[in-house]
Swiss-Prot record:
Gene3D superfamilies associated with the record: Alpha-D-Glucose-1,6-Bisphosphate, subunit A, domain 3, Alpha-D-phosphohexomutase, C-terminal domain
PTM annotation: Activated by phosphorylation.
CDD domains named in the record: GlmM
Protein name: Phosphoglucosamine mutase 2
Annotated organism of origin: Shewanella frigidimarina (strain NCIMB 400)
Gene: glmM2
Length: 450
């Protein structure tokens, strides 16, 4: 049975528009509380990012959980990975994150997970949706008796505990003293976390986009808009810059020359360091969109590489299947399962800084050995909803075969349908940009002929 409200990243949408309304949030909290209580859950921990709508949704979910007889612990604005960690630390039975990650302020979302940081299983989500439908359509939300109502407490030392956890990831024989770092917190959940972590480890920190006002989260800043970070690194003559997104589950770097170091390059740095330190377990998991340059660079170090479907959840699945520890996406979702159960921007950044210090090189130098291949990406708009038919056609398959023959071992071809628009995305990457462009245009022409 397919899920009605829960997507791959919980429930998400435009604030004030169903399902991101206070009524829906309260009834979702109640339904989740009923299902979780049936498995022995006594307390749920709630964290959020810095969107103004977070207060409204937090209060609504809190009311629903309390009505179901579940206690609530509030930790305020906190990175998504911090909520996963703190749910376990504070002995809560489950966690809730109120965030829409890198989306604009007018969006928000609600995500539930266990105290081990994993999302609820499909059966639990279906049970929650069944109760939620009753509450929405038949006003069937029943409140427990007064003496059984859930109690609510606010935890004031959550940030300090998470900061100490992050610092514990960093090698105890190293210090960031002597490094000048620019940190862009995207006016998001890490604004009071990330700068303090680096400062307490000895770095000189220039903090930008660290004054959230409820509407400026991800607004031309953070991991998805690196211009201001690049400028700040150059102006302050910093050693490097670090940018996170609104809920701090993805990270990007800028080197001292102002050049972007993306998720694929971060994976290379972590894998190279693990290989040199003798801590490498298996290989690295990327995605279908990971740059071929990463695969080539890892192969040169005899490090295996696998591609998962696009999406950090699929990277996690592949890591668990293989028993490998390092994986991620070019967008900056970086996983190192030896240190965190989910993508954690602060933890990943510390592992990169540790690798840089251990190498004795600058960030620019350590990443220079990985040569990213130029990618050509063409979006072919369809006149009908027939992407699957086109991708399965003999003509398109033949065009791909011909392109791969031309590229040989120097490139690759990837065709994907968009999950949100009537598009087929044609991606070609190779050592020869002109060849990539020509092959991408040829395949796009074949796709357009349908």
């Amino acid at each position: 049975m397919s899920r009605k409200y829960f997507g791959t990243d919980g429930v998400r949408g435009r604030v004030g528009t169903f399902p991101i309304t206070p009524d829906f949030a309260m009834k979702l909290g109640w339904a989740a509380g009923k299902v979780l209580a049936s498995t022995g859950t006594q307390e749920v921990l709630i964290g959020k990012d810095t969107r103004s709508s977070g207060y409204m949704l937090e209060s609504a979910i809190e009311a629903g959980l309390s009505a179901a007889g579940v206690n609530v612990a509030l930790i305020g604005p906190m990175p998504t990975p911090a909520v996963a960690y703190l749910a376990s630390t504070f002995r809560a039975d489950a966690g809730v994150v109120i965030s829409a990650s890198h989306n604009p302020f007018y969006d928000n979302g609600i995500k539930f997970f266990s105290n081990s940081g994993t999302k609820l299983n499909d059966q639990q989500e279906l049970e929650i949706e069944a109760l939620l439908d009753q509450a929405l359509n038949h006003n069937a939300m029943e409140c427990v008796s007064s003496e059984l109502l859930g109690k609510v407490r606010r935890i004031t030392d959550a940030a300090g505990r998470y900061i100490e956890f992050c610092k514990g990831v960093f090698a105890k024989d190293l210090t960031l003293a002597g490094l000048k770092i620019v940190v862009d917190s995207a006016n998001g959940a890490a604004y009071h976390i990330a700068p303090n972590v680096y400062r307490e480890l000895g770095a000189e920190v220039i903090s930008i986009n660290d004054k959230p006002n409820g509407t400026n989260i991800n607004d031309h800043c953070g991991a998805t808009h690196l211009d201001s970070l690049q400028t700040a690194v150059m102006v302050h003559e910093a050693d490097l810059g670090i940018a996170m997104d609104g809920d701090a589950d993805r990270v990007m770097f800028v080197d001292h020359n102002g050049h972007v170091v993306d998720g694929d390059q971060i994976l290379y740095i972590l894998a190279k360091s693990a290989k040199q330190q003798g801590t490498m377990t298996g290989g690295v998991v990327g995605t279908l969109m990971s740059n071929l340059g990463l695969e080539i660079a890892l192969k040169e170090m005899d490090i295996p590489f696998k591609r998962a479907k696009v999406g950090d959840r699929y990277v996690v699945e592949q890591l668990k299947q293989t028993g490998w520890r390092i994986g991620g996406e070019g967008s900056g979702h970086i996983l190192h399962l030896d240190h965190a159960s989910t993508g954690d921007a602060v933890v990943a950044s510390l592992l990169v800084l540790q690798a840089v210090l251990q190498s004795g090189q600058s960030l620019a130098e350590i990443v220079s050995c990985m040569k990213k291949l130029p990618q050509v990406l063409l979006n072919v708009r369809l006149t009908a909803n027939n992407a699957d038919e086109i991708l399965a056609s003999a003509a398109v398959k033949q065009a791909v075969i011909e392109a791969e023959a031309v590229l040989a071992e120097n490139g690759r071809v990837l065709l994907r349908k968009s999950g949100t628009e009537p598009l087929i995305r044609v991606m070609v990457e190779s050592t020869d940009p002109e060849m990539s462009q020509a092959q991408a245009e040829h395949i796009a022409k074949v796709v357009t002929s349908f």
